[in-house]
Amino acid sequence: MVTNRSHLSHHLPVIVLCISIFILLLIVIILSLLPPIATDALVHHLAIPKLWLLNGGFYEIKWSVFSYYPMNVDLLYLIPLYFHNDIIPNFIHMGFGIGTSWLIFRYLSNKLNRVAGLLGVLVFFSTPIVLRMSTVAYVDLGLVFFTTASILAYLHWRNEEYKKNKWLVLSAIAMGLALGTKYNALIAWLFLTLAIIFFYSRDTEKQWPAIKYGAIFFLVSL
């Protein structure tokens, strides 16, 4: 009996966190089943791909400034819209939020423990703006996912003492996808490029290689 109680108390934080995350996810799924009513979804993220489908291909929509914005995530909405489904885009956008949660969980679990990983997921997913964004066909969670992936890939490269350059390339590719999702990624792109140069130079005391790797990240991201 004592052993069972000890076992339960040991796993209680994990159980509570998992239940909390499940409840939040269930609420988001239910809300995502509603038809799109968000303004940006109706005039931009779903409207532009729908116009492309009606035209039979890409074309310049001069009357809509939104058509000149980055469209990486919006292009994914073409598939369900082709089948006249405007609900699936909500779940596609939600998927980026879940993907970001997974990245947070993996990072914190490896750095600390599973409880910290689940707590990180709960804090992220319970943030009001994340909950709201998870129920609409926007692109912001795609931006968050790609930016987070880029930063974590860079940290992995740095933790490996800059020996596995594939992580730098993966970081640059992820940042490039973020840039193709929303212009806000330009800020993260600039700061991460400078961070690569600064920390590599400080950690290795080599300036020219630092500039070289910063340039590689900068150019591959484009």
Regions found by a protein language model. Give the residues of each.
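Extracytoplasmic catalytic/substrate-binding loops of multi-pass membrane glycan-assembly enzymes
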Residues: 34-48, 54-76, 83-88
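Transmembrane-helix signature of polytopic, membrane-embedded enzymes
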Residues: 87-88, 102-126, 145, 162-163
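Perimembrane helix-loop-helix junctions
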Residues: 188-221
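Start-transfer (signal-anchor) and selected internal transmembrane alpha helices
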Residues: 1-28, 212-218
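Transmembrane alpha-helices of multi-pass, membrane-embedded glycan-processing enzymes
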Residues: 73, 77-84, 89-103, 143-146
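Membrane-interface transmembrane helices that cradle and orient dolichyl/undecaprenyl
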Residues: 150-167, 202
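Short acidic/glycine- and proline-prone juxtamembrane loop motifs at membrane-interface regions
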Residues: 132-142
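Membrane-interface alpha helices of multi-pass inner-membrane proteins
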Residues: 120-121, 154, 167-183
